[in-house]
Amino acid sequence: MQKVLDFLKEAGTYYLATMDGDQPRVRPFGTAHIFEGKLYIQTGKVKPTSKQIAANPKVEICAFKDGTWLRLCGKLVEDDRVEARKSMLDAYPELRNMYDENDGNTQVFYFKNATATFSSFTSTPEIITF
């Protein structure tokens, strides 16, 4: 899991795919954090992303760096504890001008049954599950 987190942070931007009914939706994201041994991402409850995850928690992330790409798929599970939201915002203090762990909007999810695949054109794919 740490290798996945490191890759996402080094890539800077990754792309999160969700489903909106039968229409795929993809958008850039940047938050990734390990808390209590789980990989978390963050969004706001007022965003369409939140509603799409609630309707279908199966998502996929894609990131690219230095000729290698990462595809991470799994189910997102909301963690509604203040401690989880605070940990994420402490890791990304620049988000505190938009979010607060007690604002009723900040939302964090962790990956469950995740499969991460690192691929490139020059090596065999590496698969990590968590």
Which residues fall in each region the model found?
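Acidic-histidine catalytic/liganding microenvironments
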Residues: A11, N56, Y92
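Charged, gly/pro-rich active-site loop segments
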Residues: R71-F130
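Charged, amphipathic alpha-helical segments
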Residues: M1-Q2, T43, K47, P93-E94
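A short mixed-secondary-structure module that forms the rim of ligand-binding clefts
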Residues: A32-G67
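A short, Trp-centered hydrophobic/proline-enriched beta-strand micro-motif
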Residues: D6-D20, V59-I61
